[in-house]
């Protein structure tokens, strides 16, 4: 996550946002290079069960220990992992994978346990289905027969379209062609599971602080995990591809965001290999002087961070509201599209981003769409171009809006005031009294998160006026914050009006990986983003989300022409943008000032899945000297050229897999 892509990249992960090297290959080899890597992690996992958890806190710990069928190479192409080769039928419905012989399962102590076989992948998906995986949306409507198994229509998993033809041949049968299918397979719900080991562990399987509760077939072995303290890995010396593992040890220290300066201090002392910097921190001017030739900005990631709107709030344990009428007024306001649009246009995204990136780097992280605007393209037009062409149909306020990354195309005080005036007239006619009070929760330990929400407060109150809207910041402990946002058990526990603790990273290379999560039936994510888990809630109907469902479903049915498919998904994104139910703000990772001792562009690169993120350490190379900005820029220029050539070659080779 996810990546994650997962809504697990919510609030706190932004604290450590920064792509470790944005990742590509370095031709150099230095046997004397440092073999240890140190940095931070920001949330303890609730479980190590990678098949059921879609949270980044689990991905951080498990992605380095478990290999699936594919990984990503240094240029973002899918690369063979446990799958040595693959083919797809001409109708696009049957995918067959040749399992690499000699890939083994190991205990956390490095003892060989068993060989990885095709059956382990069948076991993995069955386990995910039986345990109601948070990531089941990736497979449920794709794998033939899986939806019937999940609904109970069928109780025989052998009717599901995943088969171990023999020990070294795995086959998936799909409901409809999915050109992006293989890109899903780097995500953990499709990883293997040794059934014998799982059974032997019983209820102790995948315990969150017990490395012995898992088996490992990946580049690293988990050696230790102490809650709110540390995560430790060592190289798997018997890993099938150990030549591409250049680190011997990885040590991640827990970081709650309360001491931003600690990242640079530990980098300078040598404890950390990398440091995300915060230009608004008290020591930044000193750091900038000391490292003036070394600070560079990473590339913007594919994940999105923004603000969710709770359309069905039920709990008020953390609130500044003193009367029921204030609660009713806020709910009515948030159900009003013009009011939500006023908030959307009132957010100064550059100021919001500047709270962690500083003024110089603020624009680099700004994002105006839920789907990254250049995530896919239809001919010469990016996805953002397709959306921009359709938005004006919803109103003149969308004419000429620039949706590209790296600039704030939505902040417009005049538009915000105009939309608010329409909302106020309608709400007053409905008996609503002003100002509207908006409760926004923050983790009191996270300085940069608090500063972003304070920026949101300032933008909204300045543009709309405190006589109209008041943003009430609710400070609480880290655990309290997580329990009413990220880890909330259900929608009734989502105790907020607007939440900045929401973000998403794509899981596979198709717009649906973003847009599906806000369908009314995606309760695991709609509760976190929009405060509801009942698809038939009156609030859901009132804001028109059933129309959004129709648009997304119509796009999903288009499988023969990708350009038409992307046009239809752009229609769904246009509806979502106009609805302002989710207020986009910035990329959830990257576009950040950093210091690094990682060789630039060494590591797996990908916009999707769990094998190209900033938490996957295969391929990474460390060096003694701090990377200079000049070195980074030269490496980036070289990498971009090589990447374009490599991606084109990989695209042409796809045809050879159609049988």
Curated annotation (Swiss-Prot):
Localization of this protein: Cell membrane
Annotated GO MF terms: peptide transmembrane transporter activity
Disulphide-bonded residues: none
Domain of life assignment: Bacteria
Pfam families: SBP_bac_5 (PF00496)
InterPro entries: Peptide/Ni-bd, SBP_5, SBP_5_CS, SBP_5_dom
Signal sequence coordinates: 1-22
Residues lipid-modified (N-palmitoyl cysteine): 23
The entry's keywords: Cell membrane, Lipoprotein, Membrane, Palmitate, Peptide transport, Protein transport, Signal, Transport
Gene3D superfamilies in alphabetical order: Dipeptide-binding Protein, Domain 1, Dipeptide-binding Protein, Domain 3, Periplasmic binding protein-like II
Membrane-spanning intervals of the chain: none
Membrane association type: Lipid-anchor
Keyword hit for Transport: yes
Keyword check for Disulfide bond: no
One annotated GO biological process: peptide transport
GO cellular component, one term: ATP-binding cassette (ABC) transporter complex
Family label: Belongs to the bacterial solute-binding protein 5 family.
Name used for this protein in its record: Oligopeptide-binding protein AmiA
The organism of origin for this protein: Streptococcus pneumoniae serotype 4 (strain ATCC BAA-334 / TIGR4)
Lineage: Bacteria, Bacillati, Bacillota, Bacilli, Lactobacillales
């Amino acid at each position: 996550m996810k990546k994650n892509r997962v809504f697990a990249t919510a609030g706190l992960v932004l604290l450590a946002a920064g792509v470790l090297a944005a990742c590509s290959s370095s031709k150099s080899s230095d046997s004397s290079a440092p073999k240890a890597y140190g940095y931070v992690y920001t949330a303890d996992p609730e479980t190590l069960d990678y098949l059921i958890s879609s949270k980044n806190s689990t991905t951080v710990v498990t992605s380095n220990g478990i290999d699936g069928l594919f990984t990503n190479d240094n240029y973002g192409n899918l690369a063979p992992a446990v799958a040595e080769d693959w083919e797809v039928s001409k109708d696009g419905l049957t995918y067959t994978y040749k399992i690499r012989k000699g890939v083994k399962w190991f205990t956390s102590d490095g003892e060989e346990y068993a060989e990885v076989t095709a059956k382990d992948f069948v076991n993995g998906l069955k386990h995910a289905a039986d345990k109601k995986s948070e990531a089941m949306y990736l497979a449920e409507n794709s794998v033939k027969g899986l939806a019937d198994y999940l609904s109970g229509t069928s109780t025989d998993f052998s009717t599901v379209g995943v088969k171990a033809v023999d020990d070294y041949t795995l086959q998936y049968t799909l409901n409809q062609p999915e050109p992006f299918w293989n890109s899903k397979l780097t995500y953990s719900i499709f990883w293997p599971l040794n059934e014998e080991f799982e059974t032997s562990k019983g209820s102790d399987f995948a315990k969150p602080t017990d490395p012995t509760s898992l088996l490992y077939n990946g580049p690293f072995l988990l050696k230790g995990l102490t809650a709110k303290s540390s995560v430790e890995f060592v190289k798997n010396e018997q890993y099938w591809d150990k030549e591409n593992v250049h680190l011997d040890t990885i040590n991640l220290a827990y970081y709650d965001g309360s001491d931003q300066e600690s990242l640079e201090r530990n980098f300078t002392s040598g404890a950390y290999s990398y440091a995300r910097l915060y230009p608004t921190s008290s020591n930044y001017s000193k750091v900038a002087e000391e490292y003036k030739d070394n600070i560079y900005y990473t590339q913007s990631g594919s994940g999105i961070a923004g603000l969710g709107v709770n359309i069905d709030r039920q709990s008020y344990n953390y609130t500044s509201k003193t009367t029921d009428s204030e609660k009713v007024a806020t709910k009515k306001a948030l159900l009003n599209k013009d009011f939500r649009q006023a908030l959307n246009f009132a957010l100064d995204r550059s100021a919001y981003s500047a709270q962690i990136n500083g003024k110089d780097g603020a624009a680099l992280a700004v994002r105006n769409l839920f789907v990254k605007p250049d995530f896919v393209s239809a001919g010469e037009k990016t996805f953002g171009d397709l959306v921009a062409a359709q938005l004006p149909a919803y109103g003149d306020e969308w004419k000429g809006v620039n949706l590209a990354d790296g600039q704030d195309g939505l902040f417009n005080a005049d538009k915000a005031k105009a939309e608010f005036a329409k909302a106020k007239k309608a709400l007053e006619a409905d008996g609503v009294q002003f100002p509207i009070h908006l409760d926004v929760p923050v983790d009191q330990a996270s300085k940069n998160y608090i500063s972003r929400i304070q920026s949101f407060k300032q933008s909204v109150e300045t543009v709309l006026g405190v006589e109209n809207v008041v943003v009430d910041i609710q400070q609480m402990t880290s655990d309290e914050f997580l329990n009413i946002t990220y880890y909330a058990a259900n929608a009734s526990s989502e105790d907020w009006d607007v939440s900045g603790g929401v973000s998403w990273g794509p899981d596979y290379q198709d717009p649906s990986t973003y847009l599906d999560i806000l369908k009314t039936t995606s309760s695991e994510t709609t509760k976190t983003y929009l405060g509801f888990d009942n698809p038939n809630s009156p609030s859901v109907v009132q804001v028109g989300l059933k129309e959004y469902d129709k648009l997304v479903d119509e796009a999903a049915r288009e499988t023969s022409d990708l350009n038409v498919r992307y046009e239809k998904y752009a229609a769904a994104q246009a509806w979502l943008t106009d609805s302002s139910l989710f207020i986009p703000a910035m990329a959830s990772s990257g576009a950040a000032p950093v210091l690094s001792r990682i060789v630039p562009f060494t590591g797996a690169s990908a916009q999707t899945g769990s094998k190209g993120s900033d938490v996957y350490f295969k391929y990474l190379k460390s060096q003694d000297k701090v990377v200079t900005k000049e070195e980074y820029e030269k490496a980036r220029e070289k990498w971009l050229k090589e990447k374009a050539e490599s991606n084109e070659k990989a695209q042409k080779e796809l045809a050879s897999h159609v049988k």
